[in-house]
């Protein structure tokens, strides 16, 4: 698996939207307490759990999930969550919240001595689970998007890209043990050099 240097993604700093991503607006966001954006948090999600390509994540982030579609949906029907981006297993990228807004992805969290990571982070959901490998195209998209985000928000560095499990230990497990951090970082570095 190799990352190619054909980055189709760039951030429009006038709108804080990702060029190259499909735009679907979530109502689940608010203003950041400051303009600082200095952390990138990697998550995983699948709805129903363990199932892919259902578009239920989109419905969930837009408060349009029908609880009668699956028993698990009844459990989460009142949650209001979002992420800035979703990278599906096919490589499709969807943006739900502009980067200058506070998406609701991290919950109770801390990083580098600071609480409330939603205040200063960008959240990226990978369609997947803790127990299945992610796809090559997901790693490619994640590396390309991370590169674009670091160029646009220079306080995000490679050392400030982390997993949800790292900022909410004991509460969250994603992106999970099968997320290959070494592969991501090595290919991210080749993307930067290439």
Regions found by a protein language model. Give the residues of each.
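N-terminal catalytic cores of peptidoglycan-degrading enzymes
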Residues: 1-115
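Basic/polar, cationic surfaces and motifs that engage anionic cell-wall
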Residues: 2-15, 115-120, 129-194
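Conserved, mostly hydrophobic/aromatic
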Residues: 42, 124, 142
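Residues immediately flanking
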Residues: 44-45, 126, 165
């Amino acid at each position: 698996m190799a990352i190619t240097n054909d980055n189709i993604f760039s951030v429009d700093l006038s709108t804080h939207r990702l060029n190259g991503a499909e735009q679907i607006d979530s109502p689940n966001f608010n203003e950041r307490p400051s303009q600082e954006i200095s952390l990138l948090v990697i998550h995983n999600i699948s709805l129903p759990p363990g199932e892919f390509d259902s578009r239920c994540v989109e419905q969930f982030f837009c408060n349009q999930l029908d609880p009668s579609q699956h028993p698990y949906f009844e459990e989460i029907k009142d949650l209001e969550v979002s992420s800035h981006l979703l990278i599906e297993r096919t490589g499709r990228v969807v943006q739900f919240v502009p980067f200058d807004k506070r998406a609701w992805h991290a919950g109770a969290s801390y990083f580098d001595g600071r609480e409330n990571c939603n205040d200063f982070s960008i959240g990226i959901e990978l369609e997947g689970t803790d127990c299945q490998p992610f796809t090559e195209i997901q790693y490619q998209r994640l590396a390309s998007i991370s590169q674009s985000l670091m160029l646009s928000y220079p306080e995000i560095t490679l050392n400030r890209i982390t997993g949800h499990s790292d900022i909410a230990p004991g509460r969250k497990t994603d992106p999970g043990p099968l997320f290959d951090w070494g592969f991501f970082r090595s290919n991210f570095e080749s993307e930067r050099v290439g």
